[in-house]
Amino acid sequence: MYHKNTKYATEKRDKMLNYISTRDVNHKVSSSQAVLDGLAAGGGLYVPEDLSELKLDYKEVIVEDYRGMAKKIFGKFFPDYGEELIGDIVERSYRDKFKAEEITPLVSVDGRYILELFCGPTCAFKDVALSALPNLMSEAAKLNDFQDEILILTATSGDTGSAALHGFSDVSGIRIAVFYPDKGISETQRLQMVTQSGANTKAFGVRGNFDDAQSGVKRLFQEIPRPCEGVSLSSANSINIGRLVPQVVYYFAAYKSLVDEGEIKLGDDVDYTVPTGNFGDIMAGYLAKQMGLPVGRLICASNKNDVLTEFLETGHYDKKREFYKTSSPSMDILVSSNLERLLFFVCGAEKTKGYMKSLAETGEYQISEEELAKIKNDFVGYACSDEEGSAAIGRLFEETSYVMDTHTAIAWAVSDRDLKEESSAKNVVLSTASPYKFTGAVLAALGEKASGDDRSDMERLAELTGTEIPDPLRAIFEREVKHKDIIDVDEMKAIVVQYAGEGKE
């Protein structure tokens, strides 16, 4: 059971920032309640009511180390936690959990910059946010005197699942169930999930793709917000504002590194190229820009599933298209959840609600020319094929000995194209995963035939490139498989009700 944290609840605070639903501005909650809820009533996503309240002097932020920057940024987004508790949460979340002291190191490669976001315990960018979310959520429960046990439901296209399972493992008062597509993720990603320990963790393969799993999870939030007495649902996907906000910090961290190395002057704009399918990672960049960070363009890099590229070019969102399984599976998504937040900021709640209704009923929507023009002030989109991504991996390794994964390769190939066509600003490519999570595709890009056995392929990649296999990935082959269930989408509800009721009789 949770009990109110009176130490922090009685702390004097400034005027609170409210959170509202993207589909109903009259639905208002505190920041901690938004973290607890995950998804707003009626299916909307929580956003800050007033973006101007997030403004800060970025120059005062980037003098700090990573944890110091996180404290300032978290404090803006989550004011009802109070300064002392935010500081405690950040220290618990980021101390001694990442192999790099700077958490997200920036590396200069071939005249561009790669922001390495894979230095955490599951070797993917999701670790940055999912190291913080369990602490944000458990403290939110105390602040709101929330008595229910929390059951986290999370759909994953690969990396969120392992990071969420690891982050929430054995966290008191919280259980987690992850749903992943049974085909279309790498064997390493699958093993990370199905071998995860923790008495409060479950992982289920879903027959279908990520969109099937994500739609199923969203539907459960509407149908069974309390699947049994004493248990409430929440989310660890980036639909949860507590998952999204920690990702804002590394945009500031990248800018700080460029300034500290003398690569840019204070005030210079920086472009960020982001490989994304669900629009969360790039949405964090938009929020960083709203806070006052000098962000130039946010370049959305898509694979063959190019629904976002078409939308950013034409304003037409159409999920009624062929779904492709690619070598960058974490981006194999046709329903991009976080785009709803951008629609709200550009179009308002009523229009956003209408667009989402149209998407649900017809599979598409079209925004106005004026709305698209506003979006194009900040975003541009490109798509690349597997072949272009593979060529980028091979070319960059041959020229610089730098090895990147298949998702980063899509972003690198996009930045290649963008540099030729558009901008002279410094360009930071967000690198979202270790190449050792996708060894078969990376080996193929380097001209080697993969064996089909991820363990052997990791050893071969290490030998070929002179790089080291990350310890967390090496360890998965020694762990026992604990989660073996493969289910149909229409079984998700019964599974969740059963899991929620365990131990409640």
Where are these regions (language model features)?
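PLP-dependent amino-acid enzyme catalytic core
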Residues: 2-7, 11-505
